Regions:
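Residues that define the transmembrane beta-barrel architecture of outer-membrane proteins
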Residues: 60, 110-114, 155-161, 184, ...
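Outer-membrane beta-barrel translocator domains and adjoining extracellular loop/strand segments
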Residues: 76-83, 140-147, 187-194, 231-238, ...
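Transmembrane beta-strands of outer-membrane beta-barrel proteins
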Residues: 62-67, 128-130, 174-178, 199, ...
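Transmembrane beta-strands of outer-membrane beta-barrel pores
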Residues: 68-74, 132-138, 169-173, 180-188, ...
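Short loop/turn motifs that connect adjacent beta-strands in outer-membrane beta-barrel proteins
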Residues: 23-24, 51-62, 120-125, 170-176, ...
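Short glycine/proline- and aromatic-enriched beta-strand/turn motifs that initiate or cap beta-hairpins
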Residues: 22-107, 130
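Residues on the lipid-exposed face of transmembrane beta-strands in outer-membrane beta-barrel proteins
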Residues: 55, 66, 111, 116-124, ...
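Outer-membrane beta-barrel transmembrane domain signature
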Residues: 183-317
Length: 354
């Protein structure tokens, strides 16, 4: 079998997509029959005309999707270092390694984000896309266990951009899709964007409406993997951390002294250098709170990067789809809601001989 026939068969088999949840139709409407009697009208996907001549109804090759996601992500932090500086002093502060004395409890991020995704089917089984979005609200709660109890709650927002690729196929009545994307999340508190990698595997059946071939409902289940760059560096203003400063900073100084005085003599010798640096840093911060800031660096990680997901999509017609998905188990719980519009650019199908 030559390479052209191999590509054609592969394209004909692997046309079921998660994004459109199109299965190979067994019966055509009058409109489908009229559609197949004409030349394939769109420039994409490559090999689209061959699949069209095999009377397989492809989704519109391009789309715009609007997504809204709300969720919760649990994290863990390690290798913490702090520095105390003033904006009026251009010299960077000396960083204090506090990883030996600081212990965190739960770090939880509650997020609300919106994004737009633009995609195109390059091949009948290969989709590429770009993402741009905004985190409207991320409430982050950090509970410090030692050297003294401290609960920090902060709200951040930011923008992100990214790209992704998805491949899809069919096994009997089930579709299977593998989706991988990377996003770059920008926040004014961070020196560099946070890089997030997400991979998802989904499979499920497609239910068509006999009297309305344009419409279908797709159900799926699957798993998702999340990973991001662990090293984080940033700056936070003193007033943002302690809005009632300097009284709040004075209270933390007292907590620091209480913690140190409660150590054994051997522990006091061991942690004396760190204690004195923190004491001096907090004291300087209290005296210049309007101009002060805290420099920080740490490593963050997801303890359980895998989570389960279930979802459903209602294809109203070939152009419009509504989707919902729930992500659970692992360290992530989230709900995703989407509206998708499909379209195509008319022209000679790329690499078609006709």
């Amino acid at each position: 079998m030559n390479s052209k026939k191999t590509l054609f068969l592969l394209a004909a088999i692997l046309i079921i997509s998660f994004a459109q949840a199109q299965n190979i139709p067994t019966a055509f409407s009058k409109r489908d029959s009229a559609f197949f009697s004409k030349t394939y009208p769109y420039i994409l996907p490559i090999l689209g005309d061959k699949v069209h001549h095999a009377k397989i109804r492809l989704p519109y090759p391009m789309g715009v999707m609007f997504n809204a996601l709300v969720g919760r992500q649990d994290l863990s932090l390690s290798d913490m270092a702090l520095g105390f500086g003033r904006y009026s002093d251009p010299a960077p502060p000396n960083m204090i390694d506090v990883s030996d004395i600081i212990a965190f409890d739960d770090i939880t991020a509650q997020t609300s984000t919106f994004n737009m995704r633009i995609d195109a089917w390059l091949l009948p089984f290969l989709n590429v896309y770009g993402i741009v979005g905004q985190t409207k609200k991320a409430d982050i709660s950090v509970n410090l266990l030692k050297p003294f109890p401290l609960e920090v709650n902060t709200e951040v927002s930011g923008t992100y951009v990214g790209y992704g690729v998805m491949t899809a196929g069919a096994v009997g009545p089930l579709f299977i899709s593998l989706d991988v994307n990377r996003t770059y999340n920008y926040n004014p508190r961070l020196d560099d964007p946070a890089k997030v990698l997400i991979g998802g595997l989904r499979t499920g059946p497609v239910f068509r409406f006999k009297n309305n071939p344009d419409m279908n409902i797709t159900l799926w289940t699957g798993a998702m993997y999340s990973h991001f760059n662990g090293e984080t560096d940033g700056t936070i203003a003193a007033l943002e951390l302690a809005p009632n400063a300097p009284d709040n900073i004075e209270n933390k100084l007292n907590d620091l002294h209480t913690w140190y005085n409660g150590l054994t003599p051997l522990e006091q010798i061991l942690y004396k250098n760190i204690y004195e640096k923190l004491d001096n840093g907090l004291t300087e911060l209290k005296e210049g709170v309007e101009d002060g800031y805290i420099r920080y660096s740490f490593n963050k990680q997801i303890n359980d990067p895998w989570n389960m997901l279930v979802g459903a999509q209602w294809q109203i017609n070939y152009r419009w789809q509504l989707r919902a998905e729930a992500q659970f188990l692992g360290d992530r719980t989230a709900g995703l809601f989407s509206l998708n519009y499909r379209f195509g650019i008319h022209g000679k199908n790329w690499f078609s001989k006709k």
